[in-house]
Amino acid sequence: MPGIVLRSDDNFDASYRRFKKQTDRNLIVTEARARRFHETKTEKRKKFLIASRKKMLKRLYMMRRYESRL
């Protein structure tokens, strides 16, 4: 669990930024959002397939974009 030690010379903004950075690094917010609603195997598979299609189309777009310059 992330936690910070408050220093005497730190103001609130700096210490809040350090705490927020630690929570982002530990993926606490994303994990909490994922656990908020139960996701079935079919939903996970569907999301994975959509993400893989999106990734493939992005690669194809980049390849075609740089192919025209050659």
Swiss-Prot record:
Gene3D superfamilies xref list: Ribosomal protein S8
GO molecular function per UniProt: structural constituent of ribosome
UniProt-listed GO biological process terms: translation
Gene Ontology CC annotations of this record: ribonucleoprotein complex; ribosome
Keyword Ribonucleoprotein among record annotations: yes
Keywords from the UniProt entry: Ribonucleoprotein, Ribosomal protein
Top-level taxonomic group: Bacteria
Xref: InterPro entries: Ribosomal_bS21, Ribosomal_bS21_sf
Family: Belongs to the bacterial ribosomal protein bS21 family.
NCBIfam families: S21p (TIGR00030)
UniProt protein name: Small ribosomal subunit protein bS21
Species: Sulfurimonas denitrificans (strain ATCC 33889 / DSM 1251)
Gene it is expressed from: rpsU
